[in-house]
Amino acid sequence: MPPGRSTYRFPRFVCLSVAACANVALAQGPATSPPPDERLKADILVVAAHPDDESLIAGYLARAVLDEHKRVCVVFTTRGDAGQNLVGYEQARSIAEIREMEARQALGSIGITTVWFLRAPDTPYPDVPDVLRSLGSWNHGNVLGEVVRFIRLTRPDVVITMLPDIVVGENHEDHQASGVIATEAFDLAGDPTWFPEQVAPPEDRLWYSNLMEGLHTWQPEKLYYFTDASHLDFVKDKGPEYSMKDISPSRHVSYARIAAQETSFHKTQYDGEPATSLAGGDLSSYEQNLIFILGKSLVGGSTTGDIFQGVVSDPIPFRPSRGYQQSNTLNHGRNAEFSIELGGGWAFYRSFWPSHNLDSLPRLLEPEIGVGSGQNFPVPLVLHNNTNNAVTFTLRTQVPPGWSLDSNSAQYAHHLLPEKAFLVAANDYFPLRIRLVAPRFSKSQWQEIIWSADADGRPAGSTTLRVYVTGN
């Protein structure tokens, strides 16, 4: 090579490469936009709180996957790090690892392999469940964004989640919170203004470090709830009912047996109980009909019809819920001059249900809780003053024989007597937490507690709570 001539030829190579790419592009025709990842497409998305909550509906999920060939994905909002361990010493972070493994094995046994675990904290058991505790400790908006993302990723026709209501049963507040968030996500996943970074196109999908996710908005068609209530009279005819005694055509055993087998993988939570039932042939606890509660359907169909009744194959348009409207709030007189109502989760649900078009839920059952014999527990109350003047409320508590009031239980008060005065400012409210002590019963039974109030001598209404006291 002659002296002084450069040996650097990279620019020419680049020019040739660019020209070659241009020729290839012309040969291939116009660029196309890739469709959503079909590997994630689901017919059903289940949103539950803890690894093992899915076992409540394992019989139906087996039916859907094994015999109806539906695609099911599952999201757990927690990893169950506050749960018990009936087979070992592992707890906290370690029990979460084990419970995740158990859930994957359990769901895998019925053909469900697409499972995600969020990292919301598993809320320890309180005296009385309050969904607001879970929503607060979870960082509500963060978990909501995650569930919206999974709806947009999986594009389900149907969302199945836990009942957002307070019922007698296990009724963990995390269970309720998963239902609240799944309901909100059902209503928001089709709205591009919510979590817009999820639906914005990436700057360069063929390169690294994109911050926008490139998802599509998605409107699910139907929303169903399941419950861990200990009494199921209130769910009859509120949704489809499936027999767990039916025989699976693919497995040649009952769905009850399949459900027991699925549950048996959750050894830390159930020890050997499902295995014992399977070995002894006593499947009675798994053979009860499984009844879902229809939250809402955007495609019609009857309340008790099959979960997929009315579902269409093509995407449906976004259907916003009505949102919060004070005139539609189930406030039991809050728009009156004075009122008294149950607070906490009960007050929240009175606004939540109508805001999300859950028009059947207020009629499910009257306010209730379950407590143990002799248990000391709190009940939240709220006094409302909707006038332009401060008023003094007088509160009265009516309890059956054997009940007692904790004399230091009223928040913002020195002592709570059967009758107590509370000054409530103009256009304000006064929250109370009253602790009651249940009697000791030999047999379980329902009891009724009634609170009534006067405001400057005028009736301000009353509110009632049904309490199921478990006998010794």
Where are the predicted features?
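Intrinsically disordered, low-complexity Pro/Gly/Ser/Thr-rich segments with frequent PxxP/GP/PP motifs
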Residues: W403-R440
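Short acidic, flexible loop segments centered on an aromatic residue
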Residues: N388-S404, N408-Q411
